[in-house]
């Protein structure tokens, strides 16, 4: 099987970002959504990014942010990739001069290929667990059998992943990448270096 990339999301501390990079994570994610327990401000995110080694992609997660708010963040924080995790239309995701991905919360009956075509400009589609009223970070996995074997966009699998189940998830879904947050934490927003290492080891062994 081809190399499966990984993102550690919900980074709030420099030491957690460095632990992710040291363990071999391809990307780290910053949550710019005030209602999240993993939210960061622009000063936090910028300070963390300045300490990162090269070749670690920085991702900003946004939930129905205004264009003005997002542009203000991008003026300060050097993000490589944008992740839209709310109800954004394809038009809402365009115009920032950054590559972007769109998160979808998966429910039975969803036409994921139609969504891939709808968000034609996305570099990939992130599949997360649907919980009413919660845009993400639920810590719950969804039914992976809902993911078709072949989709026209690279798939990033999220939702309730941990070192214990990511190998099975990769074997079943065969995603382009996996995304973890709560599965490598000791508390919300506080990562656990040993859990990050265990998760990355499981990804590499899958």
Swiss-Prot record:
Underlying gene: trpF
Gene Ontology MF term list: phosphoribosylanthranilate isomerase activity
Domain of life from the UniProt record: Bacteria
Single Gene Ontology BP annotation: L-tryptophan biosynthetic process
Keywords: Amino-acid biosynthesis, Aromatic amino acid biosynthesis, Isomerase, Tryptophan biosynthesis
Name of this chain's protein: N-(5'-phosphoribosyl)anthranilate isomerase
NCBIfam families: PRK01222.1-4 (NF002298), PRK01222.1-6 (NF002299)
Family per similarity comment: Belongs to the TrpF family.
PANTHER family: N-(5'-PHOSPHORIBOSYL)ANTHRANILATE ISOMERASE (PTHR42894:SF1)
Entry-linked CDD domains: PRAI
Pfam families: PRAI (PF00697)
Catalytic activity as recorded in UniProt: N-(5-phospho-beta-D-ribosyl)anthranilate = 1-(2-carboxyphenylamino)-1-deoxy-D-ribulose 5-phosphate
Pathway(s) per entry: Amino-acid biosynthesis; L-tryptophan biosynthesis; L-tryptophan from chorismate: step 3/5
EC number: 5.3.1.24
Keyword Amino-acid biosynthesis: yes
Organism: Pseudomonas putida (strain GB-1)
InterPro entries tied to this protein: Aldolase_TIM, PRAI_dom, RibuloseP-bd_barrel, TrpF_fam
